[in-house]
Amino acid sequence: LTATISFLDKIRASSEKAILFAERKETQKMLQRVVKNRYGYTPKIINGDTPTSSDPNAGKQSRQSAIDDFQNRHGFGVIIMSPVAAGMGLNVTAANHVIHYSRHWNPAKENQATDRAYRIGQDKDVYVYYPMAVSPDFKSFDVTLDELLSRKINLASSTIFPTERIEVKPEDFEQIFNI
C-alpha cells in the first residue's frame, strides 16, 4: 500500500490520472477510502456490481457513466476497477498510469485490463506499475506470483506465434501425410 500511495503522490504532482486495478471488492473499497482520505475525493469503483450501459436500470451508475465522469475530471484522478469486470470494451484514455494493486493469475486478463489505457485517443506515454512486497530473507507471495506470470507469458509467446509467419509448402503436406 505504501508503494501505491507513493505512485499516486507522484501522479498527483504531475496532474495526471491513474487506473487502480484490484481483484477483491473489499480491497477496492479500502483503496477508495485511502484515496478519499489522502486526496479529498471519492473515486468511482467499477466491478461486477456496476451495471453495464446496456442495463436499463443503470442510469447514472453505469460503467460508462463512471468512466465519463473520470475522463471529464480536470487534473489528478483515480478510478478503481476490477481487472475482470473492466477488462474488455472500456476505454479510459484520460489515464496514463495503470497500477495493478493486486495481480490476476491470468496474464492475458491482466494485459486486457492494462489495455484500457492503451486506446485510440491516448496521447501520453502509459506507465504500468506492479507494487510488490519484497523481503531480503524470503521470497514473498508477490515475487512468486510475478515469476509465475512471467513464466506463463514466456511459455505462451514461445508456443504461439502469428499464423502469417507459417509457410506451408506442398512437400510438407506430402511428408506429414505420406502422400
Residue ranges: model-predicted function:
Residues 2, 29, 33, 90, ...:
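Alpha-helical elements of the RecA-like P-loop NTPase motor core of helicases
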